[in-house]
């Protein structure tokens, strides 16, 4: 089993558990250059809030897009947008990635900005 297949298998298991709980899902996707976050409905059909380092406003504020400080900015921004959409409580879907580095920085920044998970 290659690295991507193993990550997708881990992600599928956690997404199934989140779907059973019926909570809004804060999902994270990362690439070497960018990090993306979105809040989805429990069934995964609709995205209610999204933020990423691809956005021009975030690109100008941070020194790079593939680092921990950029992930923290995305975490703060996704929390603000989720709260504006009326969402306070979410389940964190790390997408099969380790809870370390940029994924951890995004999660902690979202918690500090008032999102509960």
Curated annotation (Swiss-Prot):
Q: Name one Pfam family in it.
A: Ribosomal_L18p
Q: Which GO terms describe its cellular component?
A: cytosolic large ribosomal subunit
Q: What CDD domains does the annotation carry?
A: Ribosomal_L18_L5e (cd00432)
- Spell out the molecular function terms from Gene Ontology: 5S rRNA binding; structural constituent of ribosome
What keywords does the record list, in alphabetical order? Answer: Ribonucleoprotein, Ribosomal protein, RNA-binding, rRNA-binding
Question: Gene3D superfamilies from the entry?
Answer: 3.30.420.100
| One BP term from GO | translation
NCBIfam families to which the protein is assigned, alphabetical: L18_bact
**HAMAP family (alphabetical):** Ribosomal_uL18_B
Q: How does it assemble?
A: Part of the 50S ribosomal subunit; part of the 5S rRNA/L5/L18/L25 subcomplex. Contacts the 5S and 23S rRNAs.
Its biological purpose: This is one of the proteins that bind and probably mediate the attachment of the 5S RNA into the large ribosomal subunit, where it forms part of the central protuberance.
Q: What is the similarity comment for this entry?
A: Belongs to the universal ribosomal protein uL18 family.
This protein is called what?
Answer: Large ribosomal subunit protein uL18
């Amino acid at each position: 089993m290659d690295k991507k297949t193993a990550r997708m298998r881990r992600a599928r298991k956690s997404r199934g558990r989140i779907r059973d709980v019926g909570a809004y899902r804060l999902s994270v996707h990362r690439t070497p250059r960018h990090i993306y976050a979105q809040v989805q409905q429990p069934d995964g059909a609709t995205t209610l809030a999204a933020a990423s380092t691809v956005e021009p406003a975030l690109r100008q504020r941070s020194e790079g897009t593939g680092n921990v400080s950029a992930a923290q900015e995305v975490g703060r921004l996704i929390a603000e947008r989720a709260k504006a959409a009326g969402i306070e409580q979410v389940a964190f879907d790390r997408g099969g990635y380790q809870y370390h580095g940029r994924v951890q920085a995004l999660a902690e920044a979202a918690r500090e900005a008032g999102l509960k998970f």
